[in-house]
Amino acid sequence: MNPESLLLSCSINNKGLTVLSETYAGGFAGALANTSAVNCTVNSTNTFEVKSTSDYAGGFAGIASLGWSADLGKGDTKNNLLGGVVDLVVKLLSSNADISPSLLSLAGVNPSYILGATVSGPLNLSGVDYVGGMTGRGNGAYIASSSADYLNKVSYWRNKVYDTASVSVKDVELSGVQSITGKNFVGGIAGSLGTAKVAGLLNDTLGLASYLGFTVDKVTVTGPTTGLSITGEQRIGGGFGDAIGGSINTVTIKNLKSVTGNNRVGGMIGLAGPGDLADTGGLTVNLLGLNHLLQVKNLLKVASGVRVTINDSHVIGVADGLTVKATGTNSDGGVVDYVAGGFVGKSHSCEINKSDVKNLKEVSANDTDGYAGGFIGTSQTGGLADVASEEDLKGWITKDTSVL
């Protein structure tokens, strides 16, 4: 059973490329839903612009999400046969912890894969919320090399329709990108990556961390020699605006000139981890698909689903030096903490290993209301303090991290 779509070795090659949409704008695809794109290429040599006048803009895809019925288009199927099937499967998911991957796929509970993708050219990318060099937003998405390990997660290879040996192994590369601008959730690779939501269902019964957490592996972003500039307001990062629930491995951001925002600004990630769960006694956003206030204690079974691990990842500034700035102030009488970090702006229960920042010139935040750090602006156990094990809460930044 191969329920997802497959795009294999497809390409766009132009001297000039402009993509303009109200929402879901992508250099290759506006939206990927339960879709695998393997070794696909977008190349524009002279001019390259992707713009969304609203949300979701990406150099490769506007959004990479679950199946249409379970996520993007779940509201479109309530009154037809497909909607009835999805509703039935969702009920089964909520009551059966031993559900099969095929049944999950039938409901669209299957992530999208961007494997071995290449985006090249003088890209200028813009939108409002969720703007990223590869994708504006990824719900449980995989952005990784087209190695056999990842191909075998896709049904066409898992079910032996295709042989992994017939596919060239390629890393994910974004080169030549000049500027990425937006309002909230803006990043060089993704505006936001998070654990997927499934038709409003909190899937602690599914083994959520292993099945629906995002994965980024072997990705390189290279700006021009003049440098890549990334600009926004909230959750702005050289690699990711925010990242909640997943793993980031072997990621490099090169020729980064500046990352600037109002708050939560980082050379690699603006905000990493579950966010401000403990600060308000609960989480009011739709994390993990919940549409109501989520108390910290309710995360007990899915604590690992909101934790972020980062390994062997690097931020390299331009020769003149990288600047990271959080420009917000409390001039209006507010009590907001403004944070900026050379690697992560705000780190909540995030494990970072063998990662560094080079050619860092300046990190700044407001003198009175801000926190700025060469590697991390603020680091704390955050929302996982009451749900993770004692072992998890021991100091999650290792001695192999550095700023040069």
Regions found by a protein language model. Name each.
Residues M1-L404:
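Surface-exposed loop/turn motifs in large extracellular/passenger domains
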